[in-house]
Amino acid sequence: MKHPRFFIVILTICSIALCSSCSSSRYAGQSLSALADRIWLFSQDHPDGFTLAIPSMTEPAVGISVAYAETQNSHSHRQLRKVVRHALKHDGIVGGWFNSDDSLYYFDSTRLFPEDSLIPALRFAKQNGQYAVFILSKGETISVE
């Protein structure tokens, strides 16, 4: 190799950039189980339901919340880990809500649409087998049908 020092410098720069980007994430270093624990505890304080952005652990105030089909019917702490895993690979949003008909608390990986995008949100909901979408700013549920 003609320029080994150049190669070492580039390798060092890339390593530093990679490490700093990993540590900048608010959930870097937290296991999937630890994130699920935090969200589980959050759900205990929000018995009627919530929408939570995992990176900031804050509740978005606006948007149309639509659940992904892949995480439907998730009720237990173990199933919540699956929901968190899916959310981290997609939009970073988790939703939870209590169903008074069956007395179960549901967790979903959620996609958030802008509030002026009701038609695309309803289309996505239908594609994902959802019965409704939720408009966060209004606290309003809109039926898909």
Model-inferred region functions:
Residues 1-8:
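Bacterial N-terminal signal peptides that target proteins for export
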Residues 9-16:
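Hydrophobic helical h-region of N-terminal Sec-dependent signal peptides
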Residues 18-21:
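C-terminal motif of bacterial Sec signal peptides marking the signal peptidase cleavage site
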Residues 26-145:
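Conserved, structured core segments of small domains
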